[in-house]
């Protein structure tokens, strides 16, 4: 356009990339809606089978809705190129495995459960240069990346939270830190008690 003529020598490429989509994920949970049986040996001379799982008829696909807004910029005949993107991703019916249940059901855990809702949002910047210095067979170019992601557990069943959090004792043997899952915090956050001083 005529009103952009001033940019011809500076901006060699400019593009915007808005996207939106919804995806489903079974997370390996396919088939859990069926009752399965396995051999349990023999009884009174006859083969015996036993249930090997609980039928999970209410299990849903994990669903992720995401939007992205990005742009590509090239400067000085693409001597410098940049890509910038912001995103917001919400996952509902989050799939988690091996959640403990009362053994009165005949099993101590469920293979999969729909655990809650989690959100990831953030931004990312990539930049690079064309070959701007060349000496003989040696050439130089620069590339860089910087990004930031914010993760938040928005909803989760109290029983599942209890199962995930488990022990609250720091283990000095293998230097493992306490990780805790709490609503309105990042999944697997490292936590500790506030110090009142040394005495």
Q: PLM features: residue spans?
A:
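Extracellular/periplasmic, surface-exposed regions of secreted and cell-surface proteins
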Residues: 1-185, 190
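Short, intrinsically disordered, charge-balanced linker/junction segments flanking boundaries
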Residues: 193-199
């Amino acid at each position: 356009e005529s009103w952009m003529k001033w940019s011809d020598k500076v901006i060699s490429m400019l593009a915007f990339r808005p996207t939106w989509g919804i995806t489903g994920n079974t997370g390996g949970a396919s088939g859990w809606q069926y009752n399965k049986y396995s051999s349990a040996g023999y009884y009174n001379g006859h083969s015996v089978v036993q249930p090997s799982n609980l039928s999970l008829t209410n299990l849903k696909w994990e669903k992720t809705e995401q939007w992205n807004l990005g742009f590509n910029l090239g400067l000085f005949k693409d001597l410098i190129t940049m890509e910038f993107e912001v995103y917001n991703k919400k996952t509902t019916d989050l799939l988690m495995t091996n959640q403990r249940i009362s053994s009165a059901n005949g099993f101590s855990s469920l293979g999969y459960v729909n655990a809650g809702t989690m959100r990831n949002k953030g931004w990312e910047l990539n930049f690079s240069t064309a070959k701007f210095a060349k000496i003989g067979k040696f050439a130089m170019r620069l590339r860089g990346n910087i990004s930031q992601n914010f993760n938040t557990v928005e909803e989760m069943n109290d029983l599942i939270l209890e199962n995930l959090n488990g022990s609250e004792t720091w283990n000095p043997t293998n230097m493992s830190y306490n990780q805790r899952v709490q609503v309105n915090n990042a999944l697997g956050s490292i936590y500790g008690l506030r110090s009142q001083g040394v005495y």
